[in-house]
Every structure is written in structure tokens, then in C-alpha cells.
Amino acid sequence: MNKRVQAFLTKMQEKELDGIIINNLKNVYYLTGFWGSNGTVFISRDRQVLVTDSRYIIAVKQETSGFEIVADRDELAVIAGIVKDMGLTRIGFEDEISVSYYHRMQAAFAGLDLFPQTQFVEGLRMIKDEAEIAAIRKACSISDQAFRDALDFIKPGKTEIEIANFLDFRMRELGASGLSFDTILASGINSSKPHAHPMHKPVELGEAITMDFGCLYDHYVSDMTRTIYLGHVSDEQAEIYNTVLKANQALIDQAKAGLGFRDFDKIPRDIIIEAGYGDYFTHGIGHGIGLDIHEEPYFSQTSRETIKTGMALTDEPGIYIEGKYGVRIEDDILITETGCELLTLAPKELIVI
């Protein structure tokens, strides 16, 4: 039995459940090592079962150990039979499912108690092991190099889409298996939109260019943002940029295990507020990364939780002035026993090309 399943069973016992159904495919991968488009896991104290279809039987045998493997397209009927044979009554399930799937579950487990579980596996995924850290670190290094190469590619007249495509293709050339999300590439006024879509707009001299991008390596993500300037930069642009950079660096300097989620957000936000731009920082400071680009933990001013060693997090302060421009600087960091390790190493001093 692997360590992840052991941790799963401990948490399940704390919730007084007899078994749990997992059908989020990334959670299935996390627990079993199997990556595919069809897979459902049932875990109880005495049996751990993976149900998939015949297309994946060879792959499952190669990628998974410690699980019973069943090839059947009616996974709920298979699991219901196991539950009945074992005499189990309290069954948990992931709560992010469709209404139609929930109705199927009610029919398959008629007469049993079903208990929705929020972020059950995602809570375990918050703390990364060495293999996960290695994959995230590699994804970050690919993103770093793609950004450095993009600095030579970007010229006046290149469109946002052309620059975004360059980043995307370059990350694949460097070994990425895919993108962790659709690249955000925003220039000029568009950079005031935190999640702008790249357009057929040419970049022009004097504009800010914000690039938010990342890649996949062994299923794990990177997530990085850099803002640069084309040709020249105004005093106001430089002031705003350096304020965001100061906020970003302050969190890197102070992030450590035991820091409250509220303080994780407050440290950089206070710097932006003190500079007079508090109303222009309109999103959270960061989130966890791993198999998903946005995953636990999330940060808010009401949370009482604390940072823990092994968390991989983003640090992404920004200032966005509607009708003018915006700045965001985003790094990926790993919480260590002595503080934090910066995973994204691409330059972030004020860059004018």
C-alpha cells in the first residue's frame, strides 16, 4: 500500500466512513499512478479497487500497483456490488459531480448513506513529495527558458497572438508535454485586464507587455507571469512596476511554514496599499499548484489555516489601472523547512527591450 493511500485511509477513518468513491481523474492519478480518460477508484479499509474500461487494461497494469483492477464501463454497478458484499453502509463521494451522475449513484446505492466530500484528495495533495517537487521544478525551468527566449523574439509589430504562440511552442520544444493553461498575453491597455486573451493586436513602443504562462511536465504545472516594456518606460510605469516587484519580493522573503494564510495575502497587499494602489490590486495573492493550475490552498483574509512545509504556491501581486496598463509579477515558490525556495528564476528586474 503506497503512502498516499495510507494517508487517504487515515483521513477516511477520521470521517467515520466505510469507503469513498473517487472519480476526479487527477485524483485517480494521484492515488494510483494511472493516467487516462476513464477511471474510478473505490477505497475501503480492506479493498482498493480501480475500475476502468478495456482500452486501458495494459496501461493500468504497467502504471499501477496495489489496486484490484476491473474492466467494466458500469463502474457504479461494480462498486455497489463490492459495497454489498463487504456489508459497508457509510460511503463517501467527491461532491464536484454532475446531477445526473449523482442520480446514478443514488440508484446504485439505494438504501445506503452517501456522504459528499469536499476537496478530500485535494487536501492531501497540498503537501508535495520529492517526485512532485522535481516535476514542478522542471516545469518551472522550462518556463524560465521560454521567457528568456521570448525576449529576443518580441519586436514592435509582433502581435499578442504571435508572442503567445512563440511561448507555447518554445515550451513544447524544451520538453513540456503541454500547457498548464491558455497563455495570457496582454499589451498596452489590454494589460489592465488580469486575464486578458491574446489578440491580433501588434505590440507598440512604450507599451507594457504582460505574459502569464506555464507548462506541464510529468503532469505537473508551472505558472509564471512577467511584465516587460517595449522601447521605453514612463516614470509612472516604473513606479508601479517597482511597487509590484517590492510586494512580490517581500512575500518571498517572509514566506515560511507556520505563516498564516491571512498574512500570506496581507504582506504583499499592505505594500501595494501603502503605495496608494490598493484599489487596483483586485485579486488574491496566490494559490497552490500541482496537478492543477489552481488547487488548494487558497488564501483569504478570513482563513485561520497556516502554511506548511512542502506546499508549492504562487506569489502574484498586481496593479491594474483601467484604460492605461497593468503589471503583474508571478513566481512559484516551495515552502521548505528553512523558509521558501524560489522555483521560477527568470529575470524580473524592470526590463525594457
Language model features: what each stretch is:
Residues 1-353:
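Active-site neighborhoods and metal-handling regions in enzymes and metal-associated proteins
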